[in-house]
UniProtKB/Swiss-Prot annotation:
Family per record: Belongs to the globin family.
Expressing tissues: Red blood cells.
Organism for this UniProt entry: Catostomus clarkii (Desert sucker)
Coiled-coil boundaries: none
Transmembrane segments: none
Signal sequence range: none
Protein name as catalogued: Hemoglobin subunit beta-B
Domain Globin: from-to ranges: 2-48
Role played: Involved in oxygen transport from gills to the various peripheral tissues.
Subunit-level organization: Heterotetramer of two alpha chains and two beta chains.
GO molecular function, one term: metal ion binding
Domain of life: Eukaryota
Protein keywords: Heme, Iron, Metal-binding, Oxygen transport, Transport
Length: 48
């Protein structure tokens, strides 16, 4: 994929607004609930 400078700027701007410490746990929980089979990849996390 080749990105234009405008596309790169838009992507960097969006990623700059994301707080991984806030969203990470919520996204992992959502992935484990919607795609229950993914829990096997996170067995070390305990019962999600």
């Amino acid at each position: 994929v080749e990105w234009t400078d405008a596309e790169r700027g838009a992507i960097l701007s969006l990623w700059g607004k994301i707080d991984p410490d806030e969203l990470g746990p919520a996204l992992l929980a959502r992935x484990x609930l919607v795609y229950x089979x993914t829990q096997r990849y996170f067995a070390s996390f305990g019962d999600l």
